Amino acid sequence: MLYKTGVEYGDYTMNHVLGCSHGCNYPCYAFAMKKRFGQIKSYEDWCKPALVENTLELLDVEIPKLKDSIISVQLCFTTDPFMYGENYTEVGQMSIASIKKLNEAEIKCTVLTKGILPIELAELSDKNEYGITVVSLSSEFKKKMEPGAAPVGDRIASLKALHDMGCKTWVSIEPYPTPNIQFQDLREILDKVSFTDHIVFGRMNYNKLVSEYVDFREFYNEKAKEIKAYCRERNISCYIKNRTITT
């Protein structure tokens, strides 16, 4: 269940669900890899997530073995810990139970979701970090690219509620689209999440429309510069993903 991730800003991760109901069409790298290696047959199968029922039992075995080498555990990299909708309550409950178990072993957890962050998370370790993905405020973009995810306004509201209760929060603005995919003002997104402690920014990959945009490299360079300046002025920490900035 627990494994060391190769993601640049990650340590350990866990993915206690196969598939994701959000069905992102950026495209989704996790879906592409699972399909390539035969773990998922189709997009429809991917959008019908299967919970690993013995997640907590696996953690009981793995935590004692790995505890001393773990800095933090991220939920999740190939699925979502808080999928949107009443049909996925069990997934969210398992996510909270897993975080509790990791916290009991004094392991910090980092969460990222396109769903709604439950307010119960505020009762867990104050070392945890809770995040949401926001790459556009457009409901039409969400409908096309993140069809099963929570409305962006609801995501932000759930993050703000945790922030107001003293939790550490962060926002992933990745994969950020070029204007030929979604014309928008990055500043509007930043202003909506200006309360957060940390922002991660990254370009959109694996979508041919990105490279069709004239000067897409310069576009991402400028947006990264804008993020850095915005965060510096407001004392927000930020991280620009590798290969977002080009020279």
Roles of regions detected by a PLM:
Residues 2-3, 7-22, 143-145, 151-152, ...:
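Non-transmembrane, interaction-prone segments in cytosolic or luminal domains
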Residues 55-226, 230:
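Conserved AdoMet/S-adenosylmethionine-binding subsite of the radical SAM
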Residues 1-21, 25-72:
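N-terminal [4Fe-4S]-dependent radical SAM core
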